[in-house]
Amino acid sequence: MARKTAAEAEETRQRIIDAALEVFVAQGVSDATLDQIARKAGVTRGAVYWHFNGKLEVLQAVLASRQHPLELDFTPDLGIERSWEAVVVAMLDAVHSPQSKQFSEILIYQGLDESGLIHNRMVQASDRFLQYIHQVLRHAVTQGELPINLDLQTSIGVFKGLITGLLYEGLRSKDQQAQIIKVALGSFWALLREPPRFLLCEEAQIKQVKSFE
């Protein structure tokens, strides 16, 4: 019986977290209240306080409970094409899948909360994603899939700007966003395969890339 009670308590806690995500997106983190979260979860305010000390702790639980689609793990055996396709799939998930979209909206639109929790979580997700991209591109270079003199740092900087724009537009508008994301990321990959001069690095940097082989 005790085990069932613990399971029910965990189920209630998760319902509160899921409800809080929706309320934070709809009302904004600063304006959301525990009463609103409780009503959305179908529980009493007391039940919320039984699991959490306050709204800040609820927010912490929301941010810790989810992995953003763009927090990818690089697997060399997956191959370059499939590794890049994973980026496309993750981007589509981030702006279309209901809960992933809500989490994206929290990280992007609510990032200036006074606690700094959302900003820190956004930085964590961004750093992990950019690390993945760096691993994919570096592996592609060492495997001969991309030019040996490709400037990885500049390429990733350009890519970061592209992804930021796609996320903002993808969350804001539904019109042909899936197609735009596919075309934009496919075009960037084609650009990396035959990069213009300003995406190429000097000979000294090429030697540094070779050292990773």
From Swiss-Prot:
Q: Keywords, A to Z?
A: DNA-binding, Repressor, Transcription, Transcription regulation
Gene3D superfamilies named in the record: Tetracycline Repressor, domain 2
User: What does the record give as the DNA-binding region?
Assistant: 33-52
The highest taxon in the source lineage is Bacteria
Q: What are the HTH tetR-type domain coordinates in residue numbering?
A: 10-70
According to its UniProt record, what is one Pfam family this protein matches?
Answer: TetR_N
Provide the GO MF annotations for this entry.
Answer: DNA-binding transcription factor activity; transcription cis-regulatory region binding
Residues in coiled coil:
none
Return the PANTHER family for the record.
HTH-TYPE TRANSCRIPTIONAL REGULATOR ACRR, HTH-TYPE TRANSCRIPTIONAL REGULATOR RUTR
Function, in words: In conjunction with SrpS represses the srpABC operon.
- Record-given protein name: HTH-type transcriptional regulator SrpR
Native species of this protein? Pseudomonas putida (Arthrobacter siderocapsulatus)
Lineage, opening ranks? Bacteria, Pseudomonadati, Pseudomonadota, Gammaproteobacteria, Pseudomonadales
